[in-house]
Amino acid sequence: MISPPPTFSFANLLNGSYGVDTPEEVERVRREQREDAEAALRNYKPLPAVDVSESVPRDEPIVSQTVTAAPVTSVDDAFVSFGAEDYLEMSPSELLSAFELMVKPLRVGEVLCSSFDRSLFISSVAMARTLLLAPLTSTRTLKRFEDLVAAIYLKTDFFLEDDGPQTDVSQSDVPGYIFEPGQHSSGFEPPPICAKCDLILYQCPCFDFNALRESCAEKTFSHDYVIEGLDGVIDNATLLSNLGPFLLPVHCSYSKTEDPDFVVDPSLARPTDRVDVHVVQAVCDTTLPTHGNYDDSFHQVFVDSADYSTDMDHVRLRQSDLVAKIPDGGHMLPVLNTGSGHQRVGTTKEVLTAIKKRNADVPELGDSVNLSRLSKAVAERFRLSYMNVDALAKSNFVNVVSNFHAYMQKWPSSGLSYDDLPDLHAENLQFYDHMIKSDVKPVVTDTLNVDRPVPATITFHKKTITSQFSPLFISLFERFQRCLRERVVLPVGKISSLEMTGFSVLNKHCLEIDLSKFDKSQGEFHLMIQEHILNDLGCPAPITKWWCDFHRFSYIKDKRAGVGMPISFQRRTGDAFTYFGNTIVTMAEFAWCYDTDQFDRLLFSGDDSLAFSKLPPVGDPSKFTTLFNMEAKVMEPAVPYICSKFYSLMSLVTRFQSPTIREIQRLGTKKIPYSDNNDFLFAHFMSFVDRLKFMDRMSQSCIDQLSIFFELKYKKSGNEAALVLGAFKKYTANFNAYKELYYSDRQQCDLVNTFCISEFRVIRRTTVKKKKNGCVDSSGVDRRPPLSQFAGGETSKTKVSRQKPASEGLQKSQRESAIYSETFPDVTIPRSRSRGLVS
């Protein structure tokens, strides 16, 4: 007797007896369906024989098959199962893949035509399977399973055309089902059999299940390099230093593309015959229209002499000391005017302006949250998203002593030794020194006509204090790199690099998050996240607690400018943990706002981040502001850009390219000191060559990629970027060509002063005046020749002139002055400019 179904009541709803498909309920429903099917087959009347060979999709030929009229006593479960349970358990992405495989919709961008309907698709699958399993009563041939699902979904004909051949569509069987004539599969797949012992592979002693599990795990750097171990005698630093030459990226060579067969119109051809300074200046004026007329020669004077007003809390000023003058031997002057500024001097007003922007006025954008609970959750998400837990458990060795010794070897010239290191317990670690960066970072926006860039600030400990904390954080960072997953890249150190072999940025979606005011926006929440992550990496808990305690409240002081102010949790831009801490904070915020499993490659460096994925990224970037107190901006349109460099595909290797707009600005820098042998200029030239070393491997495809990225990033013309590459090729060829971009007033003065008297002659106009003792010119210099050669003649002329009337001598002098003024040009050199230029 069939038990009645449970009635609807509040009690049955709470105890789960109503509305829940329990195994007993499913078995009861299947038993009722089986009984109904057996009763229907007992009353079944045979139909005329029908050839159903064409309705069965199989490759081998079938002679014929007729539906038997003999009743059966049992019914297979395949007749009563709905066939859609597997699709109901699929995830949305898997169900969408099955929909595209069967229905084959037309994709226009990200839009499907026909649109995807989950309920309609599962119903179509169930109905198609029911039609194939039911006895066929028509003489027409049904479509294949995939085509039948598409026909039901699109509401078209279920049968093939009688005259037309069957469309050859690539199909795969429905997962778990096999359609064969005369029998129905239950979806069971036989297990693999071992070829040696004929046993099931999972029960065979030859099968290594642990090896299969390790091969399925995600590969990390710790699998490639056995960097350390408890039973070895080689420490971490020694092995890394030995592996350094072998871990450098291999540069692939390329062949130059052949010349095209078609002829380019000369009027459309780009000028590539010669590179000139004026062409580069014209490109700069076109790309950066407000930079060509920028001149900050007297900017420092305006700042210090004009009225100044600012609003900051808890600022201490000491103006009893004068700002000492910085000795300056002169700088090289650029030929190009690219908007670069002079070096800034840390005066009181300049420092207050920088502190106002970089350290004061901390934004309060986040909401009130439970810091203790949420910081642990963010640290746990960080560990699961980026780190290989097995590699972290095995890599339990932090080599601090070797790194400390290597760090001290960097300072032999400065005289720093182990005896000079102070006792950290006797030092007040809450006090930080402060200074501004003399070099101002060039801006790429067209705002120099209304705005002046503010210099960045540096908050740092003394060298003796930093040298004791840096080895510990270096060791932790090395261990952190070894335990990262393969898809996570940190472009720093000996293992990682900006160049990625075997990965293409083409046909990928990019995600770049721009975090502004990153240092001063960090608060107590970020400090607690770093504390949990440092403890997970193996940092001793007392040291972690000690380090975080004197970052809760600190005091910065600029001794030169006489400015001091208290700060709290914000990032110290010059201590031993700056880069490591910024990278950890950026990765933790990114993992909380986005699911990292959707990305194929993740790059982090300080406050810069870049991610690549095959599908459009899905996440909630608003949490950067509401939770982490950051001013975040998702860059649109997104380009592969990180650390002020573009990524492009060169010779099957993803390499970085420095943006041309910043390199143009660096060609007009004003910070190169003057030297007689051009040592500083040559060092600047070698830095320029190192940044543009990728040009030797560039092809036309790389130039096109860089032009497109340039247009998308800066909203400038890509043709200008391609034109500047020719200038870069010229100035990186040799040092003599690079010297054309700079000059010095001192060099021109020395050039003028090296002229010989015989080569450089200046004729002066003489004006004879009546004197009592003789004739003297207007310059006051006696032009009489030496007495040893013309003593007699000069004396006789003087005596004769005394006997002549005064009027006659005056007329003669006037006639001589008129003759000299008409014959000789008036060229004079003032004595005060004897060391200057002559024009």
Curated annotation (Swiss-Prot):
Q: Which domain of life is it from?
A: Viruses
Region span, Disordered:
773-824
Set out the biological process GO terms recorded for this chain's protein: DNA-templated transcription; positive stranded viral RNA replication
Per its UniProt record, what PROSITE patterns does this chain match?
A: RDRP_SSRNA_POS (PS50507)
Question: What are the protein's UniProt keywords?
Answer: Nucleotide-binding, Nucleotidyltransferase, RNA-directed RNA polymerase, Transferase, Viral RNA replication
The record's section on Pfam families has:
RdRP_2 (PF00978)
Keyword Electron transport in the entry? The reply is no
Q: Name one GO molecular function term.
A: RNA binding
The reaction(s) catalysed by this protein are: RNA(n) + a ribonucleoside 5'-triphosphate = RNA(n+1) + diphosphate
Annotated RdRp catalytic domain ranges read 508-621
Coiled-coil regions listed in the entry: none
Presence of keyword ATP-binding: no
Q: What does this protein do?
A: RNA-dependent RNA polymerase which replicates the viral genome composed of 3 RNA segments, RNA1, RNA2 and RNA3.
Q: How does it assemble?
A: Interacts with replication protein 1a.
Name the family. Belongs to the ssRNA positive-strand viruses RNA-directed RNA polymerase family.
What is the protein named?
RNA-directed RNA polymerase 2a
| Source organism of the structure | Cucumber mosaic virus (strain Q) (CMV)
